[in-house]
Structure formats: structure tokens, C-alpha cells
Amino acid sequence: MKVSAATFAILLATATFRAPASASPYASDTTPCCFAYISGRLPFTHVQEYFYTSSKCSMPAVVFVTRKHRQVCANPQKKWVREYINSLEMS
């Protein structure tokens, strides 16, 4: 009986200290963060879509998704990045 009580206590302690993934305020935010920008200009013909990184990220960025499904981080303050966004919005 003592063995099963000890096992129950261990399981209870483990369940208490282990938080479910949905308890995190960031669990539903699945957008990636960027830590560096592309140094050059990405060819527009390679770009399929874009999205902005979360405001929770330390570095604001636009993520361009290429036709090969690669994600490329770009500086949202660059003129070419804003032009690409405008072109994608118009199409």
C-alpha cells in the first residue's frame, strides 16, 4: 500500500509542476521571429506571399515566402520591401 501511495504522490507532484502547453500566453502565436535581415534584394519573381512577424519579437520584420516555400526575413523600413508589399497587395 505504501508503494502505491508513493507512486500516486510522485504522479501528483509531476502533474502539478507540469503546465499544459495551452496555459502559455504565447502558445497560440506561431509566427516566427527574425534575428537577421536578408542583406540583398530578393528577386520579386521568387516571392509568393508575405507576413509580418509578431510584435512580441525583438526585431520587427517582414517575412517573404518564396515559391519554394522558403521564408526570408526582410527589413520593413527598406524601400524595396515596402514596394514588394504594395505590389503583392495589388495582385
Curated annotation (Swiss-Prot):
<comment type="similarity">
    <text>Belongs to the intercrine beta (chemokine CC) family.</text>
</comment>
<keyword id="KW-0145">Chemotaxis</keyword>
<dbReference type="GO" id="GO:0070098">
    <property type="term" value="P:chemokine-mediated signaling pathway"/>
</dbReference>
<dbReference type="InterPro" id="IPR001811">
    <property type="entry name" value="Chemokine_IL8-like_dom"/>
</dbReference>
<keyword id="KW-1015">Disulfide bond</keyword>
<dbReference type="Pfam" id="PF00048">
    <property type="entry name" value="IL8"/>
</dbReference>
<dbReference type="GO" id="GO:0061844">
    <property type="term" value="P:antimicrobial humoral immune response mediated by antimicrobial peptide"/>
</dbReference>
<dbReference type="GO" id="GO:0048020">
    <property type="term" value="F:CCR chemokine receptor binding"/>
</dbReference>
<dbReference type="GO" id="GO:0030335">
    <property type="term" value="P:positive regulation of cell migration"/>
</dbReference>
<dbReference type="GO" id="GO:0006954">
    <property type="term" value="P:inflammatory response"/>
</dbReference>
<dbReference type="GO" id="GO:0008009">
    <property type="term" value="F:chemokine activity"/>
</dbReference>
<feature type="signal peptide">
    <location>
        <begin position="1"/>
        <end position="23"/>
    </location>
</feature>
<keyword id="KW-0395">Inflammatory response</keyword>
<feature type="disulfide bond">
    <location>
        <begin position="34"/>
        <end position="73"/>
    </location>
</feature>
<keyword id="KW-0202">Cytokine</keyword>
<dbReference type="GO" id="GO:0048245">
    <property type="term" value="P:eosinophil chemotaxis"/>
</dbReference>
<dbReference type="GO" id="GO:0007186">
    <property type="term" value="P:G protein-coupled receptor signaling pathway"/>
</dbReference>
<dbReference type="InterPro" id="IPR039809">
    <property type="entry name" value="Chemokine_b/g/d"/>
</dbReference>
<dbReference type="GO" id="GO:0050796">
    <property type="term" value="P:regulation of insulin secretion"/>
</dbReference>
<dbReference type="InterPro" id="IPR000827">
    <property type="entry name" value="Chemokine_CC_CS"/>
</dbReference>
<dbReference type="InterPro" id="IPR036048">
    <property type="entry name" value="Interleukin_8-like_sf"/>
</dbReference>
<protein>
    <recommendedName>
        <fullName>C-C motif chemokine 5</fullName>
    </recommendedName>
</protein>
<feature type="disulfide bond">
    <location>
        <begin position="33"/>
        <end position="57"/>
    </location>
</feature>
<keyword id="KW-0732">Signal</keyword>
<keyword id="KW-0964">Secreted</keyword>
<comment type="function">
    <text>Chemoattractant for blood monocytes, memory T-helper cells and eosinophils. Causes the release of histamine from basophils and activates eosinophils. May activate several chemokine receptors including CCR1, CCR3, CCR4 and CCR5. May also be an agonist of the G protein-coupled receptor GPR75. Together with GPR75, may play a role in neuron survival through activation of a downstream signaling pathway involving the PI3, Akt and MAP kinases. By activating GPR75 may also play a role in insulin secretion by islet cells.</text>
</comment>
<dbReference type="GO" id="GO:0005615">
    <property type="term" value="C:extracellular space"/>
</dbReference>
